[in-house]
Amino acid sequence: MKQKTTTFKSGFVSIIGRPNVGKSTLLNRVIGQKIAIMSDKPQTTRNKVQGVLTRDDAQLVFMDTPGIHKPKHRLGDFMMKVAKNTLREVDLILYVVEADAKFGPGEQYIIERLQETKTPVFLLINKIDKVSPEELLKVIDLYKDRYPFAEIIPISALEGNNVPTLVEQIVEHMEEGPQYYPADQVTDHPERFIIAELIREKVLHLTKEEIPHSVAVVIEQIKKRDNGKVYVGATVIVERSSQKGIIIGKHGAMLKEVGQLARSDIEALLGSSVYLELWVKVQKDWRNRPSQLKDYGFNENEY
């Protein structure tokens, strides 16, 4: 009879990559719950969301960092600081690239950042369904020549292909360590943060190109009512009056749809019925104002 191992492994893992390569999709696939905002627009991940995967033999704490890019405003500066700080404090880096994307200056910039750290790096080639096996081999060779990756693993974060293999490889790479979080905890962010992110995800998804990333969501109140329902009051912050009009929509239709979709996710998160009330407020140029960035939850000292 095979003796069960008593060794428990743990460690911190950072997920990095250019904007919109599937980092949040991967994190949510690994954890099994929606905790990192997903959108088809770049720069949707702003704060360093932590996802925690606990098994009988290991605990992995994942960091989902903003896409690495050249900052264009103070919010961009904040996002880049978060990404760079994360690389210094983890045991393993997962660098996600798209199988069908060309290697350009953005990829070169990230590899140069990786060369500044001694942390082991796994290269994850995502969206493998979009290329042929021959094309995939060319992508592997291309990256092999540029950096000594500890592992190169082709995956499909959306479909889940090869993700279990990836998790096993990560655990194998970790050293013996303590359990940092309770077994039933999947993130260290408070519920208010996750609820705000779920609402923001719906705004970005429904408004498509009309609303850029000048959107923040502030949770004003969360309160359990006598009837058992949870009341959530939230304000969507935009930079221009025209954006406010788009989010509210004709006769309030857009805001209503945002609310319905967000409420469904919030109910799944909280495990109870939710009454969601939304307001929209204009705060001009908030992304360049440090005091407002702090008010809306972007505090670089915490990261």
UniProtKB/Swiss-Prot annotation:
Q: Which cysteines are joined by disulfide bonds?
A: none
Region span, G2? 43-47
User: Is-annotated flag, keyword RNA-binding?
Assistant: yes
Region entry G1, spans:
17-24
GO molecular function (one): small ribosomal subunit rRNA binding
Give the matching InterPro entries.
Answer: G_ERA_dom, GTP-bd, GTPase_Era-like, KH_dom-like_a/b, KH_dom_type_2, KH_sf_prok-type, P-loop_NTPase, Small_GTP-bd
Protein location: Cytoplasm; Cell membrane
Which segments carry the region annotation G3? 64-67
Alphabetically sorted, this entry's keywords are: Cell membrane, Cytoplasm, GTP-binding, Membrane, Nucleotide-binding, Ribosome biogenesis, RNA-binding, rRNA-binding
Please classify the protein's predominant subcellular localization into one broad category.
Answer: cytoplasm
User: Record-annotated residues binding GTP?
Assistant: 17-24, 64-68, 126-129
Q: Where are the stretches annotated G5?
A: 155-157
Example GO CC term: the record gives: cytosol
Per UniProt, residues of the Era-type G domain are 9-176
User: Residue ranges of the KH type-2 domain?
Assistant: 199-284
Q: Name one Pfam family in it.
A: KH_2
Q: Where is this region: G4?
A: 126-129
Q: Give the GO terms filed under biological process for this record.
A: ribosomal small subunit assembly
Say if the entry is tagged with keyword Cytoplasm: yes
Specify the protein's topology with respect to the membrane: Peripheral membrane protein
Q: What does this protein do?
A: An essential GTPase that binds both GDP and GTP, with rapid nucleotide exchange. Plays a role in 16S rRNA processing and 30S ribosomal subunit biogenesis and possibly also in cell cycle regulation and energy metabolism.
Q: Which PANTHER family match?
A: GTPASE ERA, GTPASE ERA, MITOCHONDRIAL
Could you describe the subunit structure of this protein? Monomer.
Instruction: Tell me the protein family, please.
Output: Belongs to the TRAFAC class TrmE-Era-EngA-EngB-Septin-like GTPase superfamily. Era GTPase family.
Q: What is this protein called?
A: GTPase Era
Record organism: Shouchella clausii (strain KSM-K16)
